[in-house]
Amino acid sequence: MAILYNIKKVVLTELDSSTGAEKVSGVKATITTAQKAELEPVLSEGDEDVLRAPDKILAVVRTDDLIYGYDVKLTDNTFSADVAGLVAGYKVTGEPSKEKYATPMMSEGFTGKPFKLDIYVANYSGDAIVNYAKVTLNKCIGKFPTMSIGDGFYAPEFEIKARENSAAKLPIKEINFVDTLPED
């Protein structure tokens, strides 16, 4: 039995778009301040045909729903240049304390890159962490983050589409249990 509580770390790893494998010298971004990750299944809904007489149902033929992805909303408590660049294609310029984030020009189109998303969630027994559930989405592409700026803290919400990594022959999602978190 797993008792999962609190996202401990999120790792985004750039993929080679032709092979689906991790890109050599690709971007790897780590989030240690993730607040929430919502995974909504994307389904191709099956059909249901009913054959009936005026006063009774004679037969029902159904085809199953099939999953072909997840739509993910990842909320972070900080705004990371590496994450924004990988997920949404932001260009980052300037010095570390005075960085400038810019969306691509319209003529450039979308410049986000495909990536793998690993979400690590603590697994508890009593009051102790025994290991971590590693939720892996094997092929993702992002959108520009939603911005809600007001009286409170700004927390970017990254919208991500996770699909099967056909090139690498990997499923949409995998869940494994690991003993430790990866090093930064």
What role is predicted for each listed range?
Residues 18-28, 120-131, 172-180, 184:
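Acidic Ser/Thr/Pro-rich low-complexity disordered segments
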Residues 64-65, 104-109, 127, 144-155:
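Exposed beta-sheet edge/beta-hairpin loop segments within beta-rich domains
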Residues 35-37, 94-100, 106-129, 160, ...:
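Surface-exposed, low-hydrophobicity beta-strand/loop segments enriched in small/polar/acidic residues
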Residues 82-86, 91, 127-129, 145-147, ...:
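Short acidic, gly/pro-rich beta-turn/loop elements at beta-sheet edges
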Residues 42-49, 87-93, 106-110, 128-135:
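N-terminal start-of-chain detector that recognizes signal peptides
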Residues 1-86, 138-150:
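Solvent-exposed edge beta-strands and adjacent loop segments
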Residues 131-184:
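Mixed-charge, glycine-accented linear interaction segment located at domain edges/termini
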Residues 64-118:
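Extracellular-facing segments of soluble proteins and assemblies that are Gly/Ser/Thr-biased and enriched
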